[in-house]
């Protein structure tokens, strides 16, 4: 709910003007999961990796819904997958998982400069493109679940419900 609450606060304070851009970070990790709208916080069956994947799916759905809302104000809202960036991601896992992630990053990851290329691209261009998922500097496909307007609407409404006491 971080993106959801933060964006609501800055919109309430009129800190976002016409022709602005909102760029959210998602991930290719969103593939292969969906959401249980009756248990978004995974209280029944929590798994850290699945929670991460679902949070990135939520970022895409949030981006799609927010882009619909702000389109009339000429505010573009997009999200991106930065790639498998060599960071300390996964350092809070047990030794075996941590080692696996480190090896994967060493041999298949990209450096931080490469990971920021799509972000910089979105900052510099595409004022009129909105509601899209970008990877490697271009609009890329995301999962079928993430493309559903119905799912975006459901997540938006559930997010309003969960965060009502903070808004």
Name the predicted role of every residue range.
Residues 36-40, 92-96, 148-149:
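Short, glycine/charged-enriched secondary-structure capping and boundary segments
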Residues 144-167:
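C-terminal amphipathic/interface module of NAD(P)-dependent oxidoreductases
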Residues 1-89, 157, 165-167:
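Rossmann-fold NAD(P)H-dependent dehydrogenase/reductase core
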Residues 42-43, 95-105:
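A short C-terminal helix-loop "cap" of Rossmann-like NAD(P)-dependent dehydrogenase/epimerase domains
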Residues 55, 102-151:
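C-terminal helical subdomain
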